[in-house]
């Protein structure tokens, strides 16, 4: 019967990496033909390129502001350093539109976006984009911080 074999374990090999987990639940970049598609190869297709470009440019044009919440009242936090980062200059070589276009492009093609926070005097001074393909989630190797909370850990390939 079909249903008797549906819920049985297919192999005894444990899933140990995020890539194996993605393959196990069907989130890999394999196509129905069995060939893998990279984000660079997908961008060579006119339909994919056009869709990603329209999304990225549309979101890139939108204003991005930071707000304080005082009770039930929202106020624009123009005096905050973080407001300047996300609305006027995220880093020394990108405009906010270019930065947000890159964010949306990475989200569409890779599913994630990472930025390195460059800190100066305890405050974030720049947001430097990091290639999502070069970042590995440190599964099970998170450290405990003095406050007792767990934080997600990432490392570069």
From Swiss-Prot:
Cross-referenced InterPro entries: Phage/GTA_portal (IPR006944)
Domain of life where this protein originates: Bacteria
Protein family per UniProt: Belongs to the phage portal family.
General remark: Encoded by the e14 prophage.
Name under which the protein is recorded: Protein BeeE
Source organism: Escherichia coli (strain K12)
């Amino acid at each position: 019967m079909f249903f008797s074999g549906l819920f049985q374990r297919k192999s005894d090999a444990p899933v140990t990496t995020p890539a194996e987990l993605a393959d196990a639940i069907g989130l890999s970049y394999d196509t129905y033909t069995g060939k893998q598609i990279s984000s660079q190869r997908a961008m060579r297709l006119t339909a994919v390129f056009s869709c990603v470009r329209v999304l990225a440019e549309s979101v890139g044009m939108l204003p991005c502001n930071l707000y304080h919440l005082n009770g039930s009242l929202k106020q624009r936090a123009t005096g905050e350093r973080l407001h300047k980062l996300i609305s006027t200059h995220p880093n020394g070589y990108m405009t906010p539109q270019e930065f947000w276009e890159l964010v949306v492009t990475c989200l569409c093609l890779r599913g994630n976006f990472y930025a390195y926070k460059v800190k100066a005097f305890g405050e974030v001074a720049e947001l430097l984009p990091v290639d999502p393909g070069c970042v590995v989630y440190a599964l099970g190797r998170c450290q405990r911080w003095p406050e007792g909370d767990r934080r997600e850990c990432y490392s570069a390939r």
